[in-house]
């Protein structure tokens, strides 16, 4: 086998591979003879079909099957010999004639080689959130609202009321698609409508009509409406006031709590603290990763981005329960491209840093992280034992421990400032971030 390496711009190169004719023809001949012993053909007994007949009828097909198997073997050997770190590969067949050498080109995209420096340029704003009894009470009130009963009242609309409305949305004076609805129930202050919409209903009475002006968010999914100033003609048809259940032993049983109200409040606070800890870690980590992407200079392999896009599509399909009749591949790649590119770049950067630093996940550290994570489950010890039996889950935990250590290592060199934030705003931002990333 003859191999010629041709380097191209950036992370691209090609391998021109030539396989001797006698090697190809020998394998094809053996395959034809093997096929002749098993194939059935009219006029011949089983195993007695002449090889020449098989070659005449199936020779081209057999040759292509042989080549399809042989090509990956040959370029894999060439890649190994040349010591190339390949991210993606495309094969282009050049010459394929009987009695002639097989020639093909393997167009390669390589993993970039780079060193990350300038960690002191990374700026991180570390959120500081104080969790007080006030936030715990508000969380309990939110849970009470889930079991609220509503009764019609004849007063002006206030926060937490449920209103039944008709509305017509207009842009530049013309009604836009999807902007008209009748008999829609909206709980004021729930955030189910775009910012400003629910506030515009406060103070209205039953039967009242009103036109409000609202601006759609810049990141709204409908690009025709994103950032657009619109009006809504609103008619209030019904106003209902919420009545919240008392926080007593009967109420807390709805959440599987057996120890009464005090136990319930303690569990709520512990859950809030646990959730807050992981969200704040994620916020800091996201800033660190963003900073790393800004200081690291390299070309991102498109093949890796494409692979990540395909994985994101399959993940979306899984989230939709494998929706029948829905072809996820019909979704445009650019819908996923930005997130995919960020994930690939972050992964490459972390790998680069870990190759230069010795971060290890000690068994005690993995155990400690596992203990924290399982507290969110109803049966922590049972869940812990199940996870410990799963090698993949343990590998993920080890990777998370190392990722946390790497993040702390970067933070020691970065410019870190603190910013006081509200608990519920942090939770809201986290939910929005998760939705944006599918």
Swiss-Prot record:
| PROSITE patterns linked | FKBP_PPIASE (PS50059)
The EC number(s) given in the record are 5.2.1.8
Query: Predominant location of this chain?
Result: cytoplasm
The reactions it catalyses are: [protein]-peptidylproline (omega=180) = [protein]-peptidylproline (omega=0)
Q: Which UniProt keywords apply?
A: Cell cycle, Cell division, Chaperone, Cytoplasm, Isomerase, Rotamase
Q: Which GO terms describe its biological process?
A: 'de novo' cotranslational protein folding; cell division; chaperone-mediated protein folding; protein transport; protein unfolding
Has the keyword Cell division been applied to this entry? yes
Q: Where in the cell? A: Cytoplasm
Supply one GO CC term from the record.
Answer: cytoplasm
Which ranges carry the PPIase FKBP-type domain? 160-245
UniProt-recorded Gene Ontology molecular function terms: peptidyl-prolyl cis-trans isomerase activity; protein folding chaperone; ribosome binding
Q: Which family does it belong to?
A: Belongs to the FKBP-type PPIase family. Tig subfamily.
Q: What is known of its domains?
A: Consists of 3 domains; the N-terminus binds the ribosome, the middle domain has PPIase activity, while the C-terminus has intrinsic chaperone activity on its own.
User: What does this protein do, in the record's words?
Assistant: Involved in protein export. Acts as a chaperone by maintaining the newly synthesized protein in an open conformation. Functions as a peptidyl-prolyl cis-trans isomerase.
What's this protein's name?
A: Trigger factor
Q: Tell me the organism's taxonomic lineage.
A: Bacteria, Pseudomonadati, Pseudomonadota, Gammaproteobacteria, Thiotrichales
């Amino acid at each position: 086998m003859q191999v010629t390496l041709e380097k191209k711009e950036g992370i691209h190169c090609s391998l021109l591979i030539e396989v001797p004719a006698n090697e190809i023809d020998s394998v094809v001949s053996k395959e034809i003879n093997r096929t002749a012993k098993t194939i059935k053909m009219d006029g011949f007994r089983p195993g007695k079909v002449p090889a020449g007949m098989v070659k005449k009828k199936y020779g081209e097909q057999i040759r292509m099957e042989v080549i399809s198997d042989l090509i990956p073997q040959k370029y894999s050997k060439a890649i190994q010999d040349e010591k190339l770190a390949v991210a993606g590969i495309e094969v282009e067949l050049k010459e394929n004639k009987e009695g002639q050498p097989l020639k093909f080109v393997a167009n390669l995209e390589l993993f970039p080689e780079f060193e990350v420096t300038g960690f002191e340029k990374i700026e991180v704003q570390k959120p500081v959130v104080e969790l007080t009894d006030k936030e715990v009470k508000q969380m309990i009130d939110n849970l009470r609202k889930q079991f609220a009963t509503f009764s019609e009242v004849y007063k002006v609309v206030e926060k937490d009321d449920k209103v039944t409305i008709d509305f017509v949305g207009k842009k530049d004076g013309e009604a836009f698609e999807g902007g008209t609805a009748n008999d829609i129930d909206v709980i004021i202050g729930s955030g189910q409508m775009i910012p400003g919409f629910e506030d515009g209903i406060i103070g209205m009475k039953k039967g009242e009509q009103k036109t409000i002006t609202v601006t759609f968010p810049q990141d709204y999914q409908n690009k025709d409406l994103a950032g657009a100033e619109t009006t809504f003609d609103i008619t209030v048809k019904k106003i209902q006031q919420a009545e919240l259940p008392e926080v007593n032993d009967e109420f807390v049983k709805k959440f599987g709590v057996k120890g009464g109200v005090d136990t319930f409040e303690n569990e709520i606070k512990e859950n809030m603290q646990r959730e807050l800890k992981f969200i704040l870690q994620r916020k800091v980590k996201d800033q660190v990763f963003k900073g790393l992407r800004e200081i690291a200079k390299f070309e991102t392999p498109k093949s890796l981005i494409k692979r990540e896009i395909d994985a994101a599509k399959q993940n979306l399909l899984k989230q939709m329960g494998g929706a029948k009749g829905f072809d996820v591949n019909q979704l445009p790649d650019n819908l996923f491209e930005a997130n995919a590119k960020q994930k690939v770049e972050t992964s490459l950067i972390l790998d680069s840093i870990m190759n230069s630093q010795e971060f290890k996940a000690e068994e005690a550290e993995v155990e400690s992280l596992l203990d924290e994570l399982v507290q969110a489950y109803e049966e922590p010890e049972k869940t812990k034992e199940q996870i410990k039996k799963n090698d993949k889950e343990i590998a993920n935990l080890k990777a998370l421990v190392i990722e946390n250590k790497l993040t702390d290592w970067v933070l020691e060199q970065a410019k870190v400032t603190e910013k006081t934030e509200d608990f519920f705003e942090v939770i809201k931002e986290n939910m929005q971030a998760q939705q944006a990333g599918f």
